[in-house]
């Protein structure tokens, strides 16, 4: 009988293939005294140049495969390799102690790694991994060591590793890489996000999978359930070969839903839309058959720049998107702060940055920055269907202030004779419990709501979703959260306003029947999830989903809801 191991289901898909175990190179970096300081600095500079060349090449590969948003990760990596403060410290150490370049770089980068990895802010935790990735690349070049090039894999394998860096994941070719398993990581890590974009099955957080598996072992994985199977017998192999074939056939069957409307079995119409963060991602929306864009994350225009983008730069980007999409495109205004930083603007240190000066709180305070964005969005509305929504709204006064500011920008454009859609919809994110509880009052002023479940879960359960010690509190099917969603939807519908959802929950097959039953109007998800969601929706009767929703609202625990949903899905025709 096979041995089963459970990890974090990070990217769906079923695979059966031989393992390729990639162990992290253990660099034996010894402190050595050197006589030629200048030569050592030259070695460092040459290694940095080679590393930047590597990263630019990987960035171009990523740009072609996955678009601008994912490729932007390597801008950050190049910034680290080029960081003058880090280089200055390394050079100073070489000069002062007359030590070898690799030892000096390892010492300095390790100090930064330790400092950042101990911080609570997920942004800095992520940066610590980036620093480690880049510094090891530079050190490898100093030592003349071969760097693993995963793009050269030319046979079907499942990669086993402690972790996969963004630069490694970007090189994977799904023709040969049938999946990957790692000791660490979770659904929101770079590796998981890349895997979903590449449509490569992945299970993370397996703790010691590199010790349990050897290269060439035959293994199976189910990226939907998070199950890995080892020590397969003949029956197990046949079973998984059948599962793989069924999965391939299912993906082929889903293609017929591309040009179909999103309907329940009893012909109730809903919308299934896509989330994107870059103008380069528009093609994936068109290919997916999504009925619009429920979330365009505008902050990537800011994060990929070395300055606040001008009104004209933003206008061109927004216009490019709405002119290609025939359905509504909802733009979230600048959601910066918390885990999202800008290289050219320093936020003050805060005890709780996720609860601090961010999103709408920042833009209402910095109306000079906000004005460029609102004017650009209004101007773009003349070229397609466009909605504007404000993030992190906590009070009605905040929403009124933001909406009034839009009206002031309209008056300016009128005076200048610049065209825009005067009926552009103005909505808000519901990601703070106060907004959900008072949704019926907010609905008097907002044209629509979009529920951001990632933050709503985090704020409802007072738990950092990036902190593994409290990850058990990430409970999207907890009845308390479902009641907040129900309050939001009923409050909006009371005033004939529509409600969408743009968090990960919108694309979750377990959540979909409940959200249908709660009468959610629009489901916005990653483009790769659209057809699967539309297919599932077509099998569900709205009347039965409403009965399910009423039952789960009376539950006490996440587990009880899970059981009801599993029974419901298992009984679909």
From Swiss-Prot:
It comes from the Bacteria. Its EC number is 2.7.3.9. The keyword Protein transport does not apply. Mg(2+) binds at residues 431, 455. SUPFAM superfamilies: Enzyme I of the PEP:sugar phosphotransferase system HPr-binding (sub)domain (SSF47831), Phosphoenolpyruvate/pyruvate domain (SSF51621), Phosphohistidine domain (SSF52009). Its cofactor is Mg(2+). GO terms for biological process: phosphoenolpyruvate-dependent sugar phosphotransferase system. One of its GO terms (molecular function) is kinase activity. Irreversibly inhibited the sulfhydryl reagent N-ethylmaleimide (NEM). Keywords: Cytoplasm, Kinase, Magnesium, Metal-binding, Phosphotransferase system, Sugar transport, Transferase, Transport. Pfam families: PEP-utilisers_N, PEP-utilizers, PEP-utilizers_C. GO terms for cellular component: cytoplasm. Phosphoenolpyruvate binds at residues 297, 332, 454-455, 465. Its main location: cytoplasm. The keyword Kinase applies. It is found in: Cytoplasm. It catalyses: L-histidyl-[protein] + phosphoenolpyruvate = N(pros)-phospho-L-histidyl-[protein] + pyruvate. The active site is at residues 190, 502. It is an enzyme of class 2 (transferase). InterPro entries: PEP-util_enz_mobile_dom, PEP-utilizing_PTS_enzyme, PEP_util_AS, PEP_util_C, PEP_util_CS, Phosphohistidine_dom_sf, PTS_EI, PTS_EI-like. The reaction takes place in three steps, mediated by a phosphocarrier histidine residue located on the surface of the central domain. The two first partial reactions are catalyzed at an active site located on the N-terminal domain, and the third partial reaction is catalyzed at an active site located on the C-terminal domain. For catalytic turnover, the central domain swivels from the concave surface of the N-terminal domain to that of the C-terminal domain. General (non sugar-specific) component of the phosphoenolpyruvate-dependent sugar phosphotransferase system (sugar PTS). This major carbohydrate active-transport system catalyzes the phosphorylation of incoming sugar substrates concomitantly with their translocation across the cell membrane. Enzyme I transfers the phosphoryl group from phosphoenolpyruvate (PEP) to the phosphoryl carrier protein (HPr). The N-terminal domain contains the HPr binding site, the central domain the pyrophosphate/phosphate carrier histidine, and the C-terminal domain the pyruvate binding site. Belongs to the PEP-utilizing enzyme family. Homodimer. This is Phosphoenolpyruvate-protein phosphotransferase. It comes from Mycoplasma capricolum subsp. capricolum (strain California kid / ATCC 27343 / NCTC 10154). The lineage of its organism: Bacteria, Bacillati, Mycoplasmatota, Mollicutes, Mycoplasmataceae.
